[in-house]
Amino acid sequence: MTKLEKANSYQEQNRIDGNEKPVFHITPPVGWMNDPNGFSIYQGKVHLFYQYYPYSDVWGTIYWGHCISEDFIKWKELPIALAPDENYDAAGCFSGSAIETKEGHVLLYTGVMENEKENGTKTVIQQQCLAIGDGICYEKVKDNPVVPAELLPSGFSKEDFRDPKIWKEDENYYMVAGNKNEQSNGQVVLFESQDLKNWKYLSVLIDNQGKYGKMWECPDFFSLGEKHVLVVSPMHMQADGQEFHNGNQSIAIIGEYDKKNYHLLDEQMISLDYGTDFYAPQTLQTEDGRRVMIAWMQSWDMNIKPLAQKWNGMMTIPRQLEIRDDILYQNPVKELEQYRTEPVILEEKEISGTCMIPGIHGRVLDLTLELLDGDYETFTIYFAKNKKYFVSFRYVRATQSIEFDRTYSGMIRDVVCQRTMKLKKTEKTLKLRLILDKFSVELFVNDGVQTFTSTFYTSLTAEDIVLECDKTALINIEKYKIELDGSKD
């Protein structure tokens, strides 16, 4: 039995019951999940691969898990796509991407192999490798690695050269990957190929100028509206005021692409999410032209899942990206709306003190609150609540900020529980859209100007939702339960 066959057999024999897991967020069948990989359209269906270690709920020698969807919301688990079974990827099949070609579904990933230096020091070499398949089964090409580390200019790190993102443009294929320069600062390198197997180095698309963390992971480069966007995840990034508190952060650099010199002229850099659990996002372009992003809904530094839980890791809900008036907006894909049931819609509801509203409770919800007017100074929403537990968002009017608190969510270890997000764009009204799915919350502020993503593993018996206002607030409320066929919250 091959390594891949053994892993697939283990996955089938140890698959975890779906009722123990979120309803519409991707989780591993069993074991560990991290970065999304190969987010792509193939033969009209959405494919998502992911960093996967089925044998434990902690990170190990990485495989590629695989799932498929027709609408971004209902996902079907497929057999494991890649195993670390060759010399060039024996230490792991690290992150990468996918593209549809005439030859089939092409996966471009980082193969990690152990290496011993002349002085006996053990290290690794990271190189880019190719596999081609039919949407279910994939075969690695005999020419691997197709982008060997030797193609990098002198002084560029061969140990940190990973996470290729591929696209096709003007009949050629292009790839960006994360790398380190001679000063050990992060940079994104750009390569070109005509046939996917023979690649040449073009340029440093952009580097971090010693400002934005160290190694840059999981780059993704695309046009959006009239701009170009580089999504990247810097490691060891310093906090700046109320920005960049995760250490391992995800940012977007927006600017103009100098195609002649293969260089991104950056105009603005923004945090992609202000929560505790968001990393390594990747995007695709849909057949109707939308740019959709998904990310790992967890953090390397804040693993809080219960000890008895045999799966570890989730993905965010896929989000549509748009740039309007130089602002990057993120919102849940529209496909979520077809699964909304049991509506509760209230207009100009007056909230004073603490209250629970009939029909508004549960842990699998799409809930929007729009604060219209009032003399209040603070407005708080508590969710996943009972007499013992709660998670909350509090809007503080004087500071134009939102405070998150999961201190009382029932965690078993001491991690970051509180965080404050300063509002970037203030409006006459404040709109808060919460997507809840058992063990996570994704907050979209003012139609997606800012987002805040966090996990919590509170007992599912805690399902109350409580609104609290220090004085009086006039609000609109729109609540839906999210229900897939046969799902249970």
Feature locations, PLM:
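Beta-rich carbohydrate-recognition and catalytic domains
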Residues: 1-163, 168-211, 223-274, 297-347, ...
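Beta-rich accessory regions
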Residues: 5-12, 250-489
